[in-house]
Swiss-Prot record:
Organism of provenance: Acinetobacter baylyi (strain ATCC 33305 / BD413 / ADP1)
UniProt cross-references to PROSITE patterns, sorted A to Z: RIBOSOMAL_S19
Family according to the record: Belongs to the universal ribosomal protein uS19 family.
GO cellular component: a single term: cytoplasm
GO molecular function, one term: rRNA binding
Protein name: Small ribosomal subunit protein uS19
GO biological process, one term: translation
Amino acid sequence: MPRSLKKGPFVDAHLFAKVEAAVAANNRKPIKTWSRRSMILPDFVGLTISVHNGRNHVPVIVTEHMVGHKLGEFAPTRTYRGHGVDKKSKR
């Protein structure tokens, strides 16, 4: 269920402060964050944000198509290694 329009998008304050500082200084270094729940705003476009996936930080280059989505959607937390192989069929 989406967030109410009257509340507006949620962005952690510390992340928003880092983004504003990077835009003001025209700094292109990746911004490291653990806030997967923050929504991507139009101010984030063009920046690289390193989102934590539980083990390491995944660099996410924000484009216009990502606006309105959450940061965690672009940093997968699980690695799929395929289903188990049938040992009987190998013989």
